[in-house]
A protein has these predicted regions:
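Polytopic transmembrane helical bundles with strong interfacial aromatic enrichment
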Residues: 2-250
Length: 250
């Protein structure tokens, strides 16, 4: 009797669920996996970035030497592992999605060569990062650095819009600028922050004082990434939201 009741309900229930729930297939499955991976890795990366800047830096200033010797070797290697690999996954997956599904679609619609677009964009990203890297190696004043970084971001956005703006749509341009800032942040993580933090952790374990300029460079690079994350996240939002900041939505 009971089994018969379940059988009577199963058919209409299946029809209802079929109307309400639709599993991704084919190309849609690849897209959603890439986007989901990008979101999860980005949350890990940026979440730890904000933890470092808003919580860890003020806390470390209050700890004495013996306490740092206990806390830093336990906390920092693990946090930095998730931090740096979260950055790698975020950027690589984001680049894959951008090239395959956003820039390629836009380029096809306007009759442009997607590889030429991608190559020009990456070249601009790397040239501007080289300038940022030199600035981070030479500028020790946080306020001056903030001004320079702001000007660099504006100049970078202007060049990207000049190269892609005539035919680029809002998604291509928003992620072109925002994703470029994300690549800068990734390069800062591996090229400056992680390299410096390895030496700082080793010195702390050995009971020696790490060079002050090393800690300062790591701090300023991390703070720069925190600044860059704000326009980066804003532009990620405008690329898929209701606000069209650049180009067209064709």
């Amino acid at each position: 009797m009971l089994s018969g009741s379940f059988a009577d309900l199963s058919a209409p229930l299946a029809l209802i669920l079929q109307d309400w729930i639709h599993g991704p297939t084919g190309d849609a499955l690849a897209r959603i996996i890439l986007r989901w991976s990008h979101f999860v890795a980005g949350i890990v990366w940026i979440g730890i970035l904000y933890f470092f800047n808003l919580i860890n830096v003020p806390l470390m200033k209050k700890l004495d030497g013996p306490t740092k010797k206990i806390v830093i070797p336990e906390l920092m290697p693990r946090a930095l592992w998730y931090f740096r690999w979260g950055a790698v996954v975020t950027v690589l997956v984001g680049l894959t999605y951008y090239a395959m599904y956003i820039m390629s679609s836009n380029a096809h619609n306007v009759g442009a060569n997607v590889w030429a677009w991608l190559g020009q964009w990456l070249l601009v990203v790397l040239v501007f990062y080289a300038i940022l890297y030199l600035v981070l190696q030479s500028v020790n004043n946080g306020n001056l650095l903030a001004v320079i970084v702001a000007l660099l971001v504006i100049a970078f956005a202007g060049v990207v819009l000049y190269l892609l703006g005539e035919k680029g749509d809002n998604k291509t341009l928003s992620i072109g600028v925002g994703g470029g800032l994300g690549i800068w942040m990734l390069l800062n993580v591996w090229g400056i922050i992680w390299r410096a933090q390895k030496k700082i952790i080793a010195a702390t374990v050995e009971g020696t004082t790490p060079p002050a300029d090393l800690a300062r460079k790591a701090f300023l690079a991390s703070r720069t990434n925190a600044w860059l994350s704000l326009p980066m996240l804003f532009l990620m939002g405008t690329s898929h939201g209701d606000y069209q900041i650049f180009g067209t939505n064709k």
